[in-house]
Amino acid sequence: MESERAAYAFLPQTPIKSTDAHLVEFSEAMRAVAKTLRQVAEGKAAAQAEAAEWKRKYELEKAVKAHRHNTVTKGCSNCDKEKLEQLASQLTLETTSVDPTSCCGNHEICSRQILQDECPGTNKISHDKIAARKAPFKLSWGCNGDNNGQHKHDFVSFEKGDITTAERSNKQILLKWESPPQTVLFVTKPNSNSVHALCAEMVRWLKEHNNINIFVEPRVSKELVTEDSYFNFIQTWDNDEEMKTLHTKVDLIVTLGGDGTVLWAASLFKGPVPPVVAFSLGSLGFMTPFSSELYRECLDHVLKRPFGITLRSRLQCHVIYDSAKNEVDTEEPILVLNEVTIDRGMSSYLTYLECYCDSSFVTRVQGDGLIISTTSGSTAYSLAAGGSMVHPQVPGILFTPICPHSLSFRPLILPEYVTLRVQVPINSRGQAWASFDGKGRKQLGPGDALICSISPWPVPTACLVDSTTDFLRSIHEGLHWNLRKSQSFDGPVA
């Protein structure tokens, strides 16, 4: 805000002596006013973000209900009132919460059955069904390799003055379909002939052997249909509004590429993300455990049998511009799967940032920049900057400086429930630039702030074996972690 800028600009210009009580009192009052104005701005930003989220949910539900009504009316114009009401009741969107213990037992998590409808204009072919539902599934815990859905709960007990924790168990999350998946979305690496050929082959195989509905990106749809009229059955979306309801139609996502393709697929979903099966066709593949040569066996297993998943946390970010309007830059939060990077861009000055964790001051960053990363992104830019590699299912936020101007500035790992605020001070000499998963750069000037917290919508990725085995395999094969020659041993001296 302009008043806060003026307050901070006035303070260093006014010489304050310890003997001048009036100036000391005035300086403290100005600082208190600036702090209060900043808190008001942050509160307004949080309220706007919450209102935007509720607005998005309302518009989504309204669009689905409106389309459902149009579909029912069009398909039953000659039906009587009683039959119409009966059909409408069968297509009711289920939005009420379900007690997990009543439908799945104490050790499983049910998916909500969400109405799957066809968006008008997305496909010109007629379909046999008026509407279909997404395939419901259950999430259960695997215990020490046993897929029976039972596990030991972690708890802390206090007995006879001693605090003890229960024995921990392997908690691999398993996904089991309650009905066969009906719709698969393909997300592919662009400008690759081999990926394009494999995508066409996989789409043909899924349609002929499993009768799966196929969604692809508009770019891929145009390429496939131009190449062969056989692919006229594939579906796509025409605008952002249709893309917002994509998660209500898609049961499974298949990515063909590297980690960048997985990041792009996750960015298409601003809310819930369907399970992702990632095939490795890129350079490094920390999130792509499946081999494209065995796609038939892999997809057959994922579509018909339980499989392990890794819930990869995402960060939700808001940019607050300290301007006269003092409004959040975007109505919806920016979701990132790897990291948010704040650097100095083209500026010749060091980046100067003030960092807060909830309401507690953390530190001031002076250096090339700062990385706020998820645990999935710990093997990306954060690792190159000296951060630790962290298992993707460890809940936390990585706080990694980039070339800090201090030998004691070491990386941190913070709990996942905190909210981080990184702001450019009013008296900063230069500006900063924020990028989100390597794209969408935004300029941050003096007084601007970036708010980051863990999103409630993770990205579930399918495991080849289990989350731990896949993670260790990726750092061994992808990074050649701790690879060295073994020390020779010639036996004891005689």
Curated annotation (Swiss-Prot):
Transmembrane segments: none annotated. It catalyses: NAD(+) + ATP = ADP + NADP(+) + H(+). GO terms for molecular function: ATP binding; NAD+ kinase activity. Coiled coil: none annotated. Keywords: ATP-binding, Kinase, NAD, NADP, Nucleotide-binding, Transferase. It is an enzyme of class 2 (transferase). Its EC number is 2.7.1.23. Belongs to the NAD kinase family. GO terms for biological process: NAD metabolic process; NADP biosynthetic process. It comes from the Eukaryota. This is Putative NAD kinase 3. The keyword NAD applies. Pfam families: NAD_kinase, NAD_kinase_C.
